[in-house]
Structures are given as structure tokens and as C-alpha cells.
Amino acid sequence: MKIGIVSKFGAPDGLCIRADSVLKGLVKRGHEVHAFTHSKTVNGLPKEQIHRFKAVWLNPHYSLDSLSSPKSITGICRKLDIDVLHIQMNSGTTEMFLPFYAHLLPPTTVTFHLAYAAGRSFYTSIFAIAWRGSLYSARKYDEIILVDPSQKHYIMEYGLPEDRLSVIRNGVDTELFSPPTRKMDDGIIDFVYVGRLSFDKGVNILLDAFGEYHQENPDSRLTLIGDGMLKSQIEDAVEDDSISWIGTIEHERIPEILQRMDAFVIPQNIGGLGLSVMEAMSCGLPVITTAIGETVRLLANDEGILVKPHSAPDVVDAMRILGDDKNLRHSMGKRCRKKVEDQYSWKNQIQQIEQVYERAIANKKR
């Protein structure tokens, strides 16, 4: 197939990691892929298959795109005879206006990356507004891919039919994200967090919880990977030698850090079983995360520990449980690795995406 992908690429966030992985997987499967993007970096494609448009970044994750980009994308799709156009929703304004060209576009598939916000807060209200804008523009897309089943109910409430919805969770490169052949035991319990430094990811809760746990167990460390609005709070925290902040790094470098750790912690209050969680599981780490959305169903009791949202005491208790029991950490980690290998490798996810493309093409011909 000739496949067009409208997305940002190359940034260290879940959307870009998924977009990069889908592009790589489709090329590996023999498809001709064209990227429509405002990103400077697109790996794995020749220059003639990268079609750029101008954009102004409103924040690290969303852009105000050139008003001419939807028309330009439509024209290139027609010229190249693209079979299916895949839009990664929630990266820029182009996705909002492409549906106005639906009658001229090839069959379309859109992936929703926003998770439904649980609870009441300023941040969940922002996510709800973004949801409504995305849902409004999605009505004219032919097929819709959700990254979390908990999104399905809310999307159907807006009148989108179930037969156009497919749930294809994030995948993991299980060869890159693999357990260490041998882990050094220095007597320190190492916890790690990977993601945005933001309130919705529960970083403030994590810092409070680790501070309390470290007072009880000085032989413990916390490593944080990522950047975001809580950067200044992190900078203050790293004055303590027990906390290390690495910042933003290349995605390919994350496994070597995870392989040195004992447990992964992300007390988020929005979303489900995110990509960073599954990558940690693939490296054989037990997980401490929040009992929200599909996480309750997807993470078994013998794979990690679920805590209540906004609860630092719960996180402290979970750290105690894992910190005190090396055998438990090991057994949980082995089960996490097996689950990712069996259910969440990118090879399986790409095949599911291809099936959605085929359905979009078949339905458009009717």
C-alpha cells in the first residue's frame, strides 16, 4: 500500500514514539510510506517521501499549523495516488481541518492519543476541551483507532458508531526494551520515572512519596527522565543526592537506564497503561501506577501495584512492599516482560493497523 501519515515525529513523547514506530513497522512490512509533518526529523524515509508544512509550536506537544497545509496534503495525496491517509490526532491544528477535504482525500484513519481525564482538576478540564475539539473533527474520518479502551465509551457518547472504532494499544520494541542479562546489586533500591514532568503524570505526588520513603530507607534512589512544567521543582529536589534528573534523552537510550533499575513508578491521574509503563515492563521492571482507566484490568496483581490517584501515602506503601522484597520484584518483572512479549509487541500492533487500513479502503469503495 501507499500510506500517508500526518503527524509530528522525533520528539520524546508518547505520540511521536508511536508515530515513529508505526512508520518503521509499515516500512519493514514493505509499504511505501509518505510523511506529512512540521517536524524537522523524520527517520527511516528518503527525502522525497517527506512532505513538510510550516507550523508554530504552542507548546512542546501541540502546534498551530499553516492554514494551507490541509489543501497541500490533499493535493499531494491525489498526485501520488495514496491508498490510505493515517492522521495522528492531538499533535496540531491540521487534523481539525483535513475533514473539510474528505471528499477529495483517500480513505482516512485517525488515531486518538488523548486519554480521558479522570477526576476533577484544572488539567482534566483542559483535556476535556481538547477531547471535544478532536471528536468534532473526527466525524468525517473513515476509521478511528483508540490507544486505550476507556476512550471508547466517551467517543460513542458523541455519536460516533462503534463499527468505526478499533482499539490498538501502544506497542513496544521488545528487542530494544529487554531485561538486562545481569543486573548489578549495589544494595540500593532504584526507582525510575519516565515521562512529562507535569501534574497530570503525578510527578509532584512522586516527589513527596519518595521523600518520605527515603527517610525510612536511605539506601534508595529516584531517577527521573523527561522535561516539563515541574522542571523547577525537580531542580530543587535534585540537590538531594538521592534524586537524579536526567532530562530529555533519545528514546533509544532509555532502555540502558531502565535495565539498571528495580521498579518503575508513575502515579498519573490521567490515562491508562501508557507507553512508558509498557516499555518498563518490557525491561522486566515491576510497576507502581494508578488504578484508573484500563490499568485496573490490564495490570494484574502479580505484575505491579496499583495506587489511588493523588495519594502519596499509597505510593510510599507500594515502595515499601517492592523495596523490602527482592524476590517479589523479580517475579513481578518476569511476568511483566512475558505480558508485553505476548500482547504488546509492535509486530502484532502493526498487523492490526493494516487491517484497519484495509477496512477503510473497502468501505470507501462502496
Region locations from a protein language model:
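Aromatic "clamp/platform" in nucleotide-sugar-dependent glycosyltransferases that forms part
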Residues: 269
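Nucleotide-sugar donor phosphate/pyrophosphate-binding loop at the beta->alpha transition
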Residues: 107, 116-140, 174
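A conserved mid-protein helix/loop that constitutes part of the nucleotide-sugar donor-binding site
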Residues: 16-21, 189, 193-212, 224, ...
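Nucleotide-activated donor-binding/catalytic signature segment of Leloir-type glycosyltransferases, i.e.
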Residues: 233-249
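Short hydrophobic beta-strand element within catalytic cores of glycosyltransferases
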Residues: 286-289
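An aromatic- and histidine-rich active-site surface loop
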Residues: 84-106, 110-117
